[in-house]
Amino acid sequence: MNFFDNTEVAFSLKSDSELERAYFLFKMIQNQPMVRIGTAVTNFALKAKLPVEGLIRSTVFDHFCGGVNEEDCLPVIDKMYEKGKVCSVLDYSVEGKEGEAIFDETMEKILKIIKFGSEKEAIPYAVFKPSGFGRFALYQKITAKKELSAAEKAEWERVKERFDKVCAVALEKNVPLLIDAEESWMQAAADDLLETLMETYNKDKAIVFNTLQMYRHDRMGSGNVPGNWQP
């Protein structure tokens, strides 16, 4: 059954005014010159510390984001679960930033999300991207099987420690953990690491899950899925 064949069901969580606002927003997004101008103006306003956050929050942000933190997301999470039994996954979106302090901060945020989700029936999973725990170029170099320098080896050990700590807490809190697949030219490094972690943490039940980029036809066969868990 395709629920979107019945718009009354598909959009039951939205009021008429919310649907009208969403329609207007998508019409605006289709206008590329308007998007370019709006992006430039918004970036300027934020850098100039102009009071535009309320406007952003009431338009683009609230349509595409649940909130600025876990607690801020709760009204949307509860509404979707209570009215439609729709579960939520909190996705910490800080892509593109690199640095050991940033990676540690991201790890702590994921740990907090796991603990937060363990108390909420409406949040059945936690998720993170490998590039949130380590440099993209490092994954890429390992995927290409290039030799690492001493500093890079130490850096990779820190990446593995972050993965391991998060997986351990996911097991402790009984929260399934999805590791979001990324670009093919860095994914093998993440796959190999995850296969080891799945062997460690999925002994009694599946807690750690690798994911696939479905546009990659070479990933579709079960034999090509790294770390398959067998009950």
Report each predicted region and the residues it spans.
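Alpha/beta catalytic barrel-like cores
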Residues: 1-177, 188, 192, 196-202, ...
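Short, surface-exposed recognition loops or helix-turn segments adjacent to catalytic cores
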Residues: 176-184, 209-214
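Short, conserved secondary-structure transition motifs
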Residues: 212-222
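Aromatic-lined glycan-binding groove of carbohydrate-active enzymes
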Residues: 224-231
